[in-house]
Amino acid sequence: MAVFTPTSVGLMRQATTFTMRIGGAESNVAVGLARLGHRVGWISKVGSDEFGKAILSFLKGEGVDVSRVKMDGEAPTGIYFKEQRRLNDTRVYYYRKGSAASRLTPADLDEKYIAEAKYLHITGITPALSENCRETIFAAMAIARRHGVKIVFDPNLRLKLWNEADRAKEVMLRMAAESDVVLPGEAEASFLFGKHSVEEWGSRLLGMGASLVVIKLGANGAHYFTNAHHEYVPGFPVERVIDPVGAGDGFAAGLLSGLLEGLRLTEAVQRANAVGALVTMVEGDADGMPERDDVERLINQRREDVTR
């Protein structure tokens, strides 16, 4: 999506100038993985307008393969506005109804392309856009399962995009049940299962079929669960958060990077925490996705602090 942000802090209605950047959960993760040195592709649909062209140009420049992105001449590219009313109070306003991305269908999927991947990363945002987007997500998941591609699901709950909360819950529970790795935050786990302990959430998701569950705690780190092990991995303190949007996507990129490289789960989650923390230090959704050197420097600093 194209993301518009007022150049000043305060109510958006008082803004006179805006900056435009590129954002969106799945494309943020793609950029994050590319900056960490991985081959990654993004499947979507954009309008054949200037915003759509800007998105493709930006992602290509970041090394993301956009060869399976379709351009739609009959629908606009989705946009959203990000308002920072005050420090640590960021609000977003979506304009995605009828967008090009909302017109994705299973026919837009390339089975061979998905089959060649190691992981398929999906979120709960795409199925919120339209009924055909829901069909497309489940079709992509079915392709992945047929070819042994592991599915990583980040609920990324955005109730503003859903017509009914019950429908959102129903769809996301089905997605979780058909995924190998599930990455909810505390609010998302509570939405899906009610207010319980982190251990209860982990147990429920494992019971639905996931082999790895990671419960994100924001600045406080994360818990991860497998059928054999549960561990808490602390986060990285950030003195001043510039922009929290995109931190969860950074976490997903960091975790996927660790899994792709065969790191121990504790190390993979630590990398995820580090990437998520670094993202918050820069304004913009994907702009703050760090490069490998930055991530390793932060992790090494933690190790040095522990050994002192």
Q: Which residue ranges define each predicted feature?
A:
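Positively charged, low-complexity intrinsically disordered leader regions
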Residues: M1-L11
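Short catalytic helix/loop segments, enriched in acidic residues and glycine
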Residues: L11-V29
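Conserved N-terminal subdomain of the carbohydrate kinase-like
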Residues: R39-G124, E296-R308
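Short, conserved phosphate/pyrophosphate- and ester-handling motifs at nucleotide-, phospho-/glycolipid
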Residues: L33, G185, G248
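Conserved phosphate-binding/catalytic region of the ribokinase-like
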Residues: A142-I143, G194-R308
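Conserved beta-alpha-beta core of the PfkB/ribokinase-like small-molecule kinase fold
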Residues: Y119, I125-R204, N220-A222
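Alpha-helix C-terminal capping segments
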Residues: N28-R39, G258-E261
